[in-house]
Amino acid sequence: GGSGVTQSGRFLAYSTDTTGDERYTLRIKDLATGELLEDTIEGISSGLTWCGEEYLFYQRVDDAWRPDSVWRHKVGTQVTDDVRVFYEPDERFWGGGSSDRMEKFLYIESGSKLSSEIWVLECDNPTGEFRCLRTREAEVEYDVTYAEVGGEPRWLVLHNAHGPNFELGECPLGPLPDDLDYLRVLVPHRDTVRLNAVGAWARY
């Protein structure tokens, strides 16, 4: 399964599968007291993402074990009160959630083997509406990472619009351009080197 600790270190959320059917049960533990909270969410995918101390995002699966939806849970409330924040009806696509290292944004990625689409929400507004950065395009995959460049907030955008080995560009926060040629290129596509991922740190 998956696991995650809140930034303060107080709560641990973890998911387990004891039958092998890849449908997980999520529990939350208070690490300060050792107490298991009553919150129990059954029949979900393995992934989970914290947003502050109060909210947890997780994925549910359909009958074919495809993660098709992302849900928001408030710690200490009934599972029946959980809110579905994203649904992917296209059976070719799988949905998943994450947050960046700085916990600035929550991300929902819906991806297939050949294309992807990303939705974002500020972590300080966990009950807000996710926004699509760029609608899916056939045979184009992209990923984004939040970074501060020269003190300015930016998106680092990894995409394969210009070739199968991917290219790295950057742009201001907000929706991505439909034409990715408008990104400022940081690392161009190369035939001999493939870019798999990007991470941002203060000096790198």
Task: Show where each model-derived region lies.
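Multi-bladed beta-propeller domains
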Residues: 1, 19-21, 29-46, 73-94, ...
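Conserved beta-propeller blade repeats
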Residues: 1-15, 42-59, 90-109, 137-158, ...
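A flexible loop/linker signature enriched in serine peptidases of the S9 family
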Residues: 16-25, 40-43, 59-69, 79, ...
